[in-house]
Amino acid sequence: MITVPHVVNLNLTGQWRENGGQI
């Protein structure tokens, strides 16, 4: 998995994660 902090990303479950997420 690629960890991207401080950025809004779309995770594998299709939910939006703010301020740090794994895609």
Curated annotation (Swiss-Prot):
Note: On the 2D-gel the determined pI of this unknown protein is: 6.9, its MW is: 19.8 kDa.
Protein name: Unknown protein NF016 from 2D-PAGE
Native source organism of the sequence: Naegleria fowleri (Brain eating amoeba)
